[in-house]
Amino acid sequence: MKNKIIDCITFFNENFIFDLRYNIIKDSVDFIKKYIDGLAMLKFNNFHWHLTEDQGWRIEIEKYPELNNIGSFRDSTLIGHYGDKPRQFDKSRYGGFYTKKEIKEIVKYANKRGINVIPEIEMPGHSQAAVDSYPMLGCSGEQVGVAPLWGVFKEIYCSKNETFDFLEDIIDEVVELFPSKYIHIGGDEAPKTNWKACGNCQDVIKR
């Protein structure tokens, strides 16, 4: 007696989010390729790549090199429990980012296996690493540090013309790397604390 196996995806979109905000894995290009192999085997067809965060900017941007010189690295990382008093940090510089060459290699590898890579560039929240790299993007105009721990932070993009120009430039470089018709722009967890105290933001709100 012959058996017939019918194998198909359950949903039109089978998505997997890959988040490296906290850690850059050693030899991570090869690691990601192995992950993609596993996703293909399990019939996933979308690889959602979380590339920017408060704790680190993980994608090369040529027009704004300080995103990688400053924003891709933090001076310390929380160790122990978030609720510890006092909190403990390792006081060790840590970070890294993916070059455009590496990203193209990963996207090509995924596409050959039927997987679409969707980049995520967070805005307006989860942008502390970017604001630290280019302080004019924030309400205070001052460096704020790349976040050394997880959480939701008040340092978000300010509604200045410079900010919108910056974000448009970022998106222009990102879409050149990813053939996906989608790009994720976050939109979550954006405290309005600084906006409420910012004259520029209040003027925009009142328009």
Region spans (language model):
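Conserved, mostly hydrophobic/aromatic
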Residues: 39, 117, 185
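Carboxylate/His-rich catalytic cores and anion/metal-binding grooves
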Residues: 43-58, 113-120, 124
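Aromatic/hydrophobic pocket-lining residues that form π-stacking "cages" and hydrophobic walls in ligand
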Residues: 35, 106, 117
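Short, well-ordered coil/turn segments that N-cap beta-strands
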Residues: 14, 43-45, 111-115, 179-183
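Active-site groove signature of glycoside hydrolases
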Residues: 123, 167-194
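Active-site beta-loop-alpha junctions enriched in small/polar residues
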Residues: 21-23, 52-56, 122-126, 188-192
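Mature N-terminal, pre-catalytic/accessory segment of carbohydrate-active enzymes
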Residues: 1-45
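Aromatic- and acidic-residue-enriched carbohydrate-binding clefts of CAZyme catalytic domains
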Residues: 55-112, 127-165, 194-207
